[in-house]
Amino acid sequence: MFVPSGDSVPDLAGCTLLMPAVSVGNVGQLAIDLIISTLNMHKIGYFYTDCLVPMVGNNPYATAEENSAELSINAEVYALPSKKLVALQLRSIFIKYKSKSFCEKLLSWVKCSGCAKVVVLSSSHSYHRNDLQLRSTPFRYLLTPSMQKSVQNKIQSLNWEEMEKTPCIPEIDDSEFCVRVPGGGITKLLYDEGCSKEIPIAILLKFVSEGDNIPDALGLVEYLNEWLQIIKPHCEDPTASSLPWKMPSSWRLLFGSGLPPALF
C-alpha cells in the first residue's frame, strides 16, 4: 500500500501519524494542509490504493516556480523526523464500499511501520448537535482504549470534552447509546477498527457547517496544538495573537480563480 519516494523505506518507529477524515467542510484535510505547510514537511511516499477516486495535480505546497510543477496524487505521506511526525494527506473521496478496506489496510500499515499513535482530524455536522453540545465548545475528542492508557491524564488536564454517546437510532426512544459522528466520513470506522485491533487512535473533531471552512481548520489545528505542541508561541503572553500557521500556496484558488476581466 505504501510506496516510498526513495530507494529505502523510511523508519517511522515511534512517530505520531496525523491524518484527516474526508468529512464535512473538508476541515481535517485543510488542517493537515496547514500542518504540512507550516512545518515544511517533506514527502516520503504515497499510498497506492484502489479505494480512493484517482486524482492528480500540481504541488499544493509549492514555494517557488522550481517546485510548483511537481505532481501530487490522492494519498501522500509527509514527514518531519526532528519532531517524530508523519502526516498522511487524503485529497479525494472514497469509492463506494471501499472505505472499510482502506481503513483495514491503513491500520495494518500503521502496525507494521511501528507508529506510536494515530491522530485523526475530523468534523461533524453542527446541525446534529443536541442541547448540551449547543451550549458548550464545538470541539470534541475520542480515544481508543489503548490510547487512553497513555494520554488520558494529559487530555483531562486540558479540560477537553469527550464526544458524547447518542441514541444509535434517534427515532427510537429506548435505543441503545453509541458514538455517532454524522458527516464524519471514515471517522467512526477508524475508531471502531482501532478499538478492535488495539491501536492507539485519538480523534479530534469540530462541529461545523459547509462554507468557508478555513477558520474551522485553524481552530482545529490550534486545538491539536494544545496537546501535541507542534509549534510553540513566540512569547508566553496568553493574550498574544494566534500562532503563525502558514497557509499553503494552493489555498489562493480554494474557491476557484478570480472573475475574468472580460466580463466587465
Curated annotation (Swiss-Prot):
**Gene3D superfamilies to which the protein is assigned, alphabetical:** PAC-like subunit
Q: Name one Pfam family in it.
A: PAC2
Entry keyword set = Chaperone, Nucleus, Phosphoprotein
Post-translational note: Degraded by the proteasome upon completion of 20S proteasome maturation.
Q: Which domain of life is it from?
A: Eukaryota
Q: Which family does it belong to?
A: Belongs to the PSMG2 family.
Q: What is this protein called?
A: Proteasome assembly chaperone 2
